[in-house]
A protein has these predicted regions:
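Short, membrane-interfacial amphipathic segments enriched in basic
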Residues: 1-11, 76, 314-325, 374
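Extracytoplasmic/periplasmic domains immediately adjacent to an N-terminal transmembrane anchor
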Residues: 1-175, 343, 368
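Junction motif at the cytosolic side of a transmembrane helix
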Residues: 2, 197, 276, 335, ...
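Alpha-helical transmembrane segments and their short interhelical loops
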Residues: 33-37, 217-291, 296, 342-348, ...
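Transmembrane helix segments
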Residues: 37-47, 281-321
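Membrane-interfacial helix-loop-helix junctions in multi-pass membrane proteins
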Residues: 167-171, 303-358
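Long, hydrophobic alpha-helical segments
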Residues: 174, 178-195
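Transmembrane helix boundary and interhelical loop/hinge segments in multi-pass membrane proteins
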Residues: 191-213, 225, 370
Length: 374
């Protein structure tokens, strides 16, 4: 009972210390509001409002059909330019695409001469250039074929292919980006808060005060784990409800309660990692460097940004020992596919085991550090 009281008391002390740290509070608010919204809305897997200009030297029915086939939301309304303006507009970056339809284009098409349309692409805009190039080729080819046939061509297939996209019918990138941003920020902040709390006490000299109190290293460490974990847990819940569900209108298919249980288990592991890193670093700059070395692989190789099946087998095996891999798996299953506990229980077991291992390793390292300071 005394141990529990000490853990609660020390945890409340950590929360009061965090409330006085304006920079850390600003980071928490930013990470679960602006960062989530921008990650969801800025990243897009499709072409969106790409600027295009067309120099129509033919002024024929076919060239008009091609020009009118570029419309929102994929392209802005095509600008009508002169051929002499094309190079200057590309150099200034005004348009991502400029197209030159040559004279007598329609006549040559009808005569079967295979005339060429020049398409200039500003490759410095990588996303638009890569996607727009294929979009424009398909649009121009489709309009030319339609014009030649005088009617829309419907290819009759020997079988009916009925394609249905499950869990994200419109293939909306925002649904994926918002949830993955929350997952990544949960990992990042849980490590930062616990590690920074330990380093802050060392820099301010308050860790020496704890050494003369009747508390154990386990109680000190556990207080930091539950207090900083609680902050991240509540912040992630608020972000999921207010930013993702309410503001972005992203549907949550599964149980939020079950997801938050998974968050709590993941926080148990990641906060322990933060404590371990805090014992290794001697200052906040060193801790920041360690963060880069640890956080990037955890986020990049957990299966959220890149499919795990696309990674080398030895990388997959290594990442199975990391909590983020199983957290991403259960989060996607619950929030996207509406999975219940009977489906995600293996991930829960993995998180408990991995969290226990990291907590034990961090506790041993923390005790060694405390003994060296005593």
């Amino acid at each position: 009972m005394r141990t529990l009281k000490n853990i609660i008391y020390l945890g409340m002390k950590e929360l009061r210390s965090l409330m006085r740290d304006k920079a850390m509070l600003a980071l928490i608010v930013f990470a679960f509001t602006v960062s989530i919204y921008s990650s969801a809305t800025v990243t897009s897997g499709s072409l969106h409002l790409a600027p295009i200009a067309i120099a129509d030297q033919d002024r024929s029915q076919l060239s008009e059909r091609i020009i009118n086939s570029f419309y929102e939301p994929y392209f802005l309304a095509p600008a009508d330019i002169d051929i002499s303006q094309m190079d200057g507009l590309m150099d200034s970056g005004t348009y991502t695409f400029t197209m030159d339809i040559p004279p007598n284009f329609q006549r040559d098409v009808l005569a079967g001469r295979r005339p060429a349309i020049q398409l200039n692409v500003d490759a410095t805009r990588m996303s638009q250039a890569f996607l727009g190039n294929s979009y424009i080729q398909n649009i121009v080819t489709g309009e030319v074929n339609t014009f030649l046939a005088k009617t829309r061509q419907n290819t009759v297939l020997p079988v009916d292919l009925d394609i249905r996209a499950r869990f994200n019918p419109n293939l909306n990138q925002m649904w994926f980006g918002s949830v993955m941003a929350i997952i990544n920020n949960i990992t990042m902040l849980s490590i930062v808060l616990t590690g920074a709390a330990l380093i802050r006490e060392r820099e301010h000299g308050t860790i020496e005060h704890l050494l003369v109190m009747p508390v154990t290293p386990f109680e000190i460490m556990m207080s930091k784990v539950w207090s900083m974990g609680l902050v991240v847990l509540l912040a992630s819940l608020g972000s999921l409800l207010l930013i993702v569900r309410f503001l972005l209108q992203v549907p949550i298919e599964g149980s939020i309660t079950l997801f938050m249980c998974g968050v709590a288990l993941s926080l148990f592991a990641t906060t322990s990692i933060g404590i371990f890193m805090g014992t290794l670093a001697r200052s906040m700059p060193q801790f920041g460097l360690l963060m880069i070395m640890v956080l990037l692989p955890l986020n990049m190789l957990s299966g959220g940004m890149t499919s795990r099946e696309s990674m080398p087998q030895f990388v997959q095996d290594i990442m199975q020992t990391m909590p983020t891999t199983h957290f991403v798996s259960l989060a996607q299953a619950i929030l996207y596919r509406g999975a219940d506990f009977l489906i995600v229980w293996p991930q829960f077991i993995y998180l408990i085991i991995i969290g226990g291992v990291f907590f034990g390793a961090a506790l041993l390292r923390f005790r060694k550090t405390i003994s060296a300071m005593a």
